[in-house]
Amino acid sequence: MASTSTSTQPSGWRHTASQYAALTKPRVTQLAVFCAVIGMFLATPGMVPWPVLIGGAVGIWLFAGAAFAINCLVERKIDAMMRRTAWRPSASGELGARQILLFSLVLGGAGMWTLHVFANDLTMWLTFATFIGYAIIYTLLLKPATPQNIVIGGLSGAMPPALGWAAVANSVPAEAWILVLIIFTWTPPHFWALALYRRADYAKSGLPMLPITHGEKFTLLHILLYTLIMVAATILPFVHGMSGYLYLAVALVLGFGFLVHAWRMYRNYSDALAQKTFRYSIVYLSLLFAALLIDHYFKFGPQGAAL
């Protein structure tokens, strides 16, 4: 009996740990931290100091996890209605409200301390403001109130490059805000593609998502329009002198691919196309920022002295 108890205990701990980890929405957090790290490298012509790189990334990850945990806490009843999110420990009841709140407070507190020690106070307070923007303003106020929630609230999700930049430079210049603008304009077509092929789920939730309140064709038109705006925004790093021809070529090719996805959906919508567009949007952003990083260090073509 003793051996059986010993052998099953670790799996119990692993399960609990995985439940808490799920609250942080790991895939979304990874993309946010990736964009923050790119912002760190773009803020300096040389190497980012290791303490700042690691400490800044960890601090931003902790804050992001705290914000997503609060989101799961606030939306636990809504998540329970939706097939896509019903498995979350907050929705299933495997973790209670007090546990989730305490977990979020611990992550947020640890994030503040980490950024204060390894980065700077500007980064700490900007990240805290981003936390408030997502966990409170977006989740509590905007998301249940307006179908434009993802547009207005998208700023908090677009902040990671500026946070990374601030961690290295202790400032947030125009170059950092260009990166924020790219993600800000990327967010609506990315999210609305998901909302389209998951609209049955969102209809159950009662949240005023654009496909529910304004219909499929209206949403598809807005995806197409925002994709055009996003492609224009991605050219700004080249225009501003942050990048060279390699980035410009990658941005144009990737942007053309995004436009093709958006146009195909608009002309002949299917859930399969929406799902492909959603997945492409994640690859798109990752490759776009990777191209920025490569061009930053290898100098493919004329770059200004913006830094």
UniProtKB/Swiss-Prot annotation:
Disulfide bridge partners, by residue number: none
First-level EC class: transferase
More about this protein: Carbon 2 of the heme B porphyrin ring is defined according to the Fischer nomenclature.
Ranges that cross the membrane: 28-48, 50-70, 100-120, 122-142, 149-169, 176-196, 218-238, 243-263, 282-302
Keyword set includes Transit peptide: no
GO molecular function, a single term: protoheme IX farnesyltransferase activity
Annotated Gene Ontology cellular component terms: plasma membrane
GO biological process: heme O biosynthetic process
PANTHER family, alphabetized: 4-HYDROXYBENZOATE SOLANESYLTRANSFERASE, PROTOHEME IX FARNESYLTRANSFERASE, MITOCHONDRIAL
Keyword line: Cell inner membrane, Cell membrane, Heme biosynthesis, Membrane, Transferase, Transmembrane, Transmembrane helix
HAMAP family: CyoE_CtaB
Protein name per the record: Protoheme IX farnesyltransferase
Catalytic activity: heme b + (2E,6E)-farnesyl diphosphate + H2O = Fe(II)-heme o + diphosphate
Pfam families according to UniProt: UbiA
Topology of this chain in the membrane: Multi-pass membrane protein
Subcellular location, record wording: Cell inner membrane
Function: Converts heme B (protoheme IX) to heme O by substitution of the vinyl group on carbon 2 of heme B porphyrin ring with a hydroxyethyl farnesyl side group.
Family from the record: Belongs to the UbiA prenyltransferase family. Protoheme IX farnesyltransferase subfamily.
Pathway(s) it belongs to: Porphyrin-containing compound metabolism; heme O biosynthesis; heme O from protoheme: step 1/1
